């Protein structure tokens, strides 16, 4: 089986790959880059579910970054369970075709409960007092613990929002 590294680099276009991105430029020169079209809505959860299933939001069900629970009438934002996404994922197809297939799914959405060998994703805790405690979800559970022991805690507040930047990207690359 051929090894594949699939990088989901949101917002990166072919025009931005060059002198300041030497490793990506080398991969592109080797024929390892392919253009992809967008979908609507162009939001994280919908886009990643489309990439993973090859289907549109109307089919996989991830129509936004939030979900309305019709029983409670509450919106849950940024759900991470793989079970929210309907349809066969690319790694499920690969494993069906070759039972020896192995997959690591790092920092994609829909990681929790995904049928992969290793996964890790940001998963903060929100205690009743309103705090946000940075943490990661991983499978197997020791995987995230081992990574944090080896390379330090995940720089959660450098991953999202106004501080998003290189510290989290470096941590993910090291992982």
Where are the model-predicted features located?
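N-terminal start-of-chain detector that recognizes signal peptides
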Residues: 6, 21-24, 36, 75-77, ...
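His/Asp/Glu-rich, glycine-adjacent segments
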Residues: 55-175
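Short, structured active-site-proximal loop/turn typified by the sulfatase FGly-forming signature C/S-X-P-X-R
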Residues: 15-59, 104
């Amino acid at each position: 089986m051929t090894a594949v590294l699939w990088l989901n680099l949101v917002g990166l276009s072919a025009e931005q790959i060059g002198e300041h991105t030497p490793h990506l430029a080398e991969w592109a020169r080797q024929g390892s880059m392919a253009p992809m079209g967008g979908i609507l809505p162009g939001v994280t959860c919908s886009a990643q579910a489309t990439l993973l299933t090859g289907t549109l939001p109307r089919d996989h069900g991830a129509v936004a970054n939030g979900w309305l629970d019709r029983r409670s009438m509450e919106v849950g934002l940024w759900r991470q369970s793989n079970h929210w996404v309907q349809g066969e994922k690319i790694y499920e197809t690969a494993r069906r075709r070759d039972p020896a297939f192995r997959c690591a799914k790092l920092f994609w959405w829909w990681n929790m409960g995904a049928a992969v060998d290793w996964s890790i994703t940001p998963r903060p805790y929100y205690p009743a007092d309103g705090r946000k405690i940075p943490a990661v979800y991983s499978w197997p559970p020791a995987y995230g613990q081992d990574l944090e022991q080896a390379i330090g805690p995940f720089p959660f507040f450098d991953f999202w929002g106004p501080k998003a930047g290189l510290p989290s990207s470096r941590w993910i690359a090291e992982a």
